A protein has these predicted regions:
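TRAFAC-class small GTPase G-domain
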Residues: 2-190
């Protein structure tokens, strides 16, 4: 049994396929750092506008996507939340393939959370030497327990030749969006 509609047959025109979601740019952004530095909380706050303090660590990697409009361009940000646990560390170089940018997070209330910065910057630059990397100090809302001052974060960012330094609060949302916008602007300027 055949079904057809005369009007459709007569009015058949050339159809131009355009994907429902077309972007001017798509950027892969890595979130790296020790366990407990709020990488997942940062991704969730930016992409989903939720704060969910969780003890659950990503098993290897979690993915988030957010579309932003900047400088008249529609930009898709693919955010890769890389598990910081020791048992997944061997996967980090594999996940970093094709990355356009990265954020290395540390906890300003725990100076030990900076232990991996040298290793992480080396892994990222091994894959792409001019990759923009931002150093992010998390948990800025807990000022009374601060172990690392802002000036120290800036020094570390300069020492490792990182693009910039920022402090965020995933609980209040302070500087969360600005950090991603700053990184996206760096990518657009390249």
């Amino acid at each position: 049994m055949k079904f057809w509609n005369k009007r459709i047959v007569r009015k058949r025109r050339k159809v131009i396929f355009r994907p429902p979601y077309s972007y001017d740019y798509t950027f892969k952004i890595m979130l790296l750092g020790e366990p407990g530095v709020e990488k997942t909380a940062l991704a969730q706050k930016f992409c989903l506008d939720i704060f969910s303090p969780s003890e659950k660590l990503p098993v290897g990697v979690d993915f988030y996507v957010k579309t932003v409009e900047l400088q008249g361009k529609k930009i898709k940000l693919q955010i890769w939340d890389i598990g910081g646990d020791e048992r997944f560390r061997f996967l980090t170089p594999i996940y970093c393939n094709g990355a356009n940018a990265a954020m290395i997070l540390f906890d300003i209330t725990n100076s030990q959370s900076l232990n991996q910065i040298s290793e992480l910057t080396n892994i990222l630059r091994e894959k792409k030497s001019d990759i923009p990397i931002i150093l992010i100090g998390s948990k800025m809302e807990i000022k009374e327990f601060r172990e690392l001052q802002r000036e120290r974060g800036i020094e570390i960012a300069k020492k490792y030749n990182l693009s910039s330094y920022s402090e965020i609060s995933t609980k209040t949302g302070q500087n969360v969006e600005n950090s991603f916008i700053d990184l996206t602007e760096i990518l657009l300027s390249q």
